């Protein structure tokens, strides 16, 4: 097999905030590069890259799908490995793993929303691994789209040096093309063929001033980086050629001194091919990346491996996945040398040799078997007996340990228990496999309750783990789902008479009660039913009175508003009558149940919700944001104090507002604040919240 020239390989990731259009952009790339003949839409659940069922249902990307495609640029075929990374903060681990093995990133921004929190997180992660970037401002066809505003945010919020390479033609819904500032040509895409073709036209007159201004800025930015160009720039700016600009821009991008910025609308098929051209033009190939550093495990000395097929083999496993057809798949990036299917490698962590039975190139979750993999490529292999994320795989005779990856600790936990005896063993195995795949997911046993507690990076993360246990491992579990237990109570007194009569030949039914319903007395201890019998003169025989009390107690299990348990209730039985033949205990019990329903409606029933005591420990600079967030959650801040250099905020917040709080707190404080929460008391919900709760409860009851 002829050796491929590494110059024509690109390992790139597409990274951004959730909903900036990452998966749609990747789908367009696959369409234009000929891998996919039908464009998959995320909102249809048909996107090729979102291969897990959960992803197609939720319209978000959870696992980094790896895909391989080809692209022609300047009559040269390039090989591109693309990793589509998730943008949800719960799945930061996937982004971290991907960036570790990529050579370049297309940082995607929404033209409307600009730099969002996850864009910032991904940006910092890319800085950590020194990954060069190209900016693509997507959704240019949307209302409020502003390309240059996003460029400004990249400078101000991310500290990058964004340099626009294009000026958009047309605003929002009229967005139809761009002016290329390097070639000074205007490009208009044709809608008839999904933007496959475009027309080159003269620059619209109204854009000439903008084009000249931004082109001058581009040339100046590039000249600042390249001394030879700087001299030309001062002597005669017009003598700088297109190729010189491209060469200097490429060097500056790889050096992370400049972020080339482009724009388009992936959904409307505009701008994706130009972005692909820019990937080939400006982002590094494996050959541009310096030799990878590592440690020789035998000598402890630092060593480096050049990205060349003649060097000894070295690779890093960056993801382990369980595939239903081929078993355990290890995704890895080959940094040096060649690996043939059927050969042996050394896993430096375990010290064991492993036989690689098959090597695959991945297209989302479909595998294409290949004979060998070379330096600079990304692939997946099966046959490993013991492999973990971050393991180094090397030539048997030339071991090297590459820098592994570090992952954050989990932040949220829930209890799970198997539904049946048959599920017990399967659950242990499934959780073990899932923990093997995902370093931010942990499993432990609670010492007090003996329950299995699973922990992860957020509620969504754990939902998906439970879903995968069911779908992939056929394990049914009961989950300690954090759900709010609302209650109901009444706020005023109401008098009511209930007569229960049933005559249907033979012996009938009869009961007649007169009672007052109201809130419990202040000195009544506890909750539940306060029942007072004030009947005089045997109007209701004594043996029937306990049945009336029993009827009310039973009825309190269902509140009149939404069917929640009634927290407390006082019933005073005042009067009534009975029939010597037809009255019995059941008749009086039913009369109480029926009377309760009508009386409770008249007695001003309200919804109660659990209020939690919350304590947050935070650095001072985040305190304002955190207090503001607690107020937005209907929280009441009771106390603020100092504790060993940090601020402590004590508040009471409704439990219903606290779901997802750990994740928000992590975002607000960049992971530096911590919180604890415990139950305090029940309190009445505001009317707007009550309406929502009642509506939701009735909706659930009707399903």
From Swiss-Prot:
Keywords from UniProt, A to Z, are: Cytoplasm, Elongation factor, GTP-binding, Nucleotide-binding, Protein biosynthesis
Ligand binding (GTP): 16-23, 84-88, 138-141
**The family this protein is said to belong to:** Belongs to the TRAFAC class translation factor GTPase superfamily. Classic translation factor GTPase family. EF-G/EF-2 subfamily.
- Recorded protein name is Elongation factor G
Record-linked HAMAP family: EF_G_EF_2_B
Q: Entry's NCBIfam families?
A: EF-G (TIGR00484), PRK12740.1-5 (NF009381), small_GTP (TIGR00231)
Q: A Gene Ontology MF term for this entry? A: translation elongation factor activity
The tr-type G domain extends over 7-287
Functional summary from the UniProt entry: Catalyzes the GTP-dependent ribosomal translocation step during translation elongation. During this step, the ribosome changes from the pre-translocational (PRE) to the post-translocational (POST) state as the newly formed A-site-bound peptidyl-tRNA and P-site-bound deacylated tRNA move to the P and E sites, respectively. Catalyzes the coordinated movement of the two tRNA molecules, the mRNA and conformational changes in the ribosome.
Residues annotated as signal peptide: none
């Amino acid at each position: 097999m002829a050796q491929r020239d590494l110059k024509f390989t690109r390992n790139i990731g597409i990274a951004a905030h959730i909903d900036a259009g990452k998966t749609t952009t990747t789908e367009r790339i696959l369409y234009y590069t000929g891998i996919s003949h039908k464009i998959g839409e995320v909102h249809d659940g048909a996107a090729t890259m979102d291969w897990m069922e959960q992803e197609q249902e939720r319209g978000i990307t959870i696992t980094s799908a790896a895909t391989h495609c080809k692209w022609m640029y300047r009559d040269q075929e390039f090989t591109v490995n693309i990793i589509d990374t998730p943008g949800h903060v719960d799945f930061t681990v996937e982004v971290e793993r991907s960036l570790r093995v990529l050579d370049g990133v297309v940082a995607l921004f929404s033209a409307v929303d600009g730099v969002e929190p996850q864009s910032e997180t991904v940006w910092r992660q890319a800085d950590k691994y020194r990954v060069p970037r190209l900016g693509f401002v997507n959704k240019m066809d949307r209302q409020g789209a502003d390309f240059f505003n996003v460029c400004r945010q990249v400078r101000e919020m991310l500290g990058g040096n964004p340099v626009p390479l294009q000026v958009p033609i047309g605003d929002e819904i009229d967005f139809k093309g761009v002016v290329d500032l390097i070639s000074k040509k205007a490009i208009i895409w044709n809608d008839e063929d999904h933007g496959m073709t475009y027309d080159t036209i003269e620059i619209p007159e109204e854009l000439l001033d903008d084009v000249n201004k931004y082109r001058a800025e581009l040339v100046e930015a590039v000249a600042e980086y390249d001394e030879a160009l700087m001299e030309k720039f001062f002597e005669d700016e017009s003598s700088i050629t297109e190729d010189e600009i491209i060469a200097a821009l490429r060097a500056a991008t790889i050096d992370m001194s400049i972020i080339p910025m482009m724009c388009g609308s992936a959904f409307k098929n505009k701008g994706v091919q130009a972005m692909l051209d820019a990937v080939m033009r400006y982002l590094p190939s494996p050959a541009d990346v310096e030799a990878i550093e590592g440690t020789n495990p035998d000598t402890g000395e630092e060593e480096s491996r050049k990205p060349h097929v003649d060097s000894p083999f070295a690779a890093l496993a960056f993801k382990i996945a369980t595939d239903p057809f081929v078993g355990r798949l290890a995704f890895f990036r080959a940094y040096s040398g060649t690996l043939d299917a059927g050969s042996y490698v050394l896993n430096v962590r375990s010290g064991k040799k492993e036989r690689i039975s098959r090597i695959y190139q991945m297209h989302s979750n479909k595998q294409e078997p290949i004979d060998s993999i070379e330096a600079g490529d990304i692939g997946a292999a099966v046959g490993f007996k013991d492999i973990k994320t971050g393991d180094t795989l090397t030539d048997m005779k030339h071991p090297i340990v590459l820098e592994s990856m570090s992952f954050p600790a989990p932040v949220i936990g829930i209890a799970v228990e198997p539904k049946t005896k048959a599920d017990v063993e399967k659950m242990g195995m499934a959780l073990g496999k899932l923990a093997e795949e995902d370093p931010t997911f942990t499993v432990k046993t609670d010492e007090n309750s003996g329950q299995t507690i699973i922990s992860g990076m957020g509620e969504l993360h754990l939902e998906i783990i439970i879903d995968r246990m069911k779908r992939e491992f056929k394990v049914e579990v009961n989950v300690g789902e954090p759900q709010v237990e609302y209650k109901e109570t009444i706020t005023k007194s109401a008098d009511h008479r209930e007569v229960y009569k049933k005559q249907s030949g033979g012996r009938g039914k009869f009961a007649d009660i007169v009672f007052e319903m109201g809130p419990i007395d202040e000195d009544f201890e506890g909750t539940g039913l306060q029942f007072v019998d004030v009947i005089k003169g045997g109007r209701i025989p004594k043996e029937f009175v306990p049945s009336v009390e029993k009827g009310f107690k039973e009825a309190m299990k269902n509140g009149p508003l939404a069917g929640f348990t009634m927290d407390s209730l006082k019933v005073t039985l005042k009067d009534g009558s009975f029939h010597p033949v037809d009255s019995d205990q059941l008749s009086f019990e039913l009369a109480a149940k029926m009377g309760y329903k009508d009386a409770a409606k008249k007695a001003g029933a309200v919804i109660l919700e659990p209020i939690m005591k919350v304590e947050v420990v935070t650095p001072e600079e985040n305190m304002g944001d955190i207090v503001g967030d607690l107020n937005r959650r209907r929280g009441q801040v009771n106390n603020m104090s100092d504790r060993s250099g940090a601020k402590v905020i004590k508040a009471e917040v409704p439990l219903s507002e606290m779901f997802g709080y750990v994740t928000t707190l992590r975002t607000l404080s960049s992971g530096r604040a911590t919180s604890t929460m415990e139950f305090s008391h029940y309190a009445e919900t505001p009317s707007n919240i009550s309406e929502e709760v009642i509506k939701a409860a009735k909706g659930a009851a009707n399903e």
